[in-house]
Swiss-Prot record:
The lineage of its organism: Eukaryota, Sar, Stramenopiles, Ochrophyta, Bacillariophyta. It comes from the Eukaryota. One of its GO terms (cellular component) is chloroplast thylakoid membrane. This is Cytochrome b6-f complex subunit 6. InterPro entries: Cyt_b6/f_cplx_su6. Keywords: Chloroplast, Electron transport, Membrane, Photosynthesis, Plastid, Thylakoid, Transmembrane, Transmembrane helix, Transport. The keyword Transport applies. GO terms for molecular function: electron transporter, transferring electrons within cytochrome b6/f complex of photosystem II activity. It comes from Thalassiosira pseudonana. The gene is petL. The 4 large subunits of the cytochrome b6-f complex are cytochrome b6, subunit IV (17 kDa polypeptide, PetD), cytochrome f and the Rieske protein, while the 4 small subunits are PetG, PetL, PetM and PetN. The complex functions as a dimer. The chain crosses the membrane at residues 3-23. It is found in: Plastid, Chloroplast thylakoid membrane. Belongs to the PetL family.
Length: 31
């Protein structure tokens, strides 16, 4: 059960990191 929770945390962290990088690149292009 704890493995499943850690898996979801890892997926959520990777998704947040990817979306943060995407928004960062968009803001750099706008400047």
């Amino acid at each position: 059960m704890s493995i499943l929770i850690n898996y979801f945390l890892l997926v959520g962290f990777c998704f947040a990191l990817a979306s943060g990088l995407f928004l960062g690149l968009k803001s750099i292009k706008l400047i």
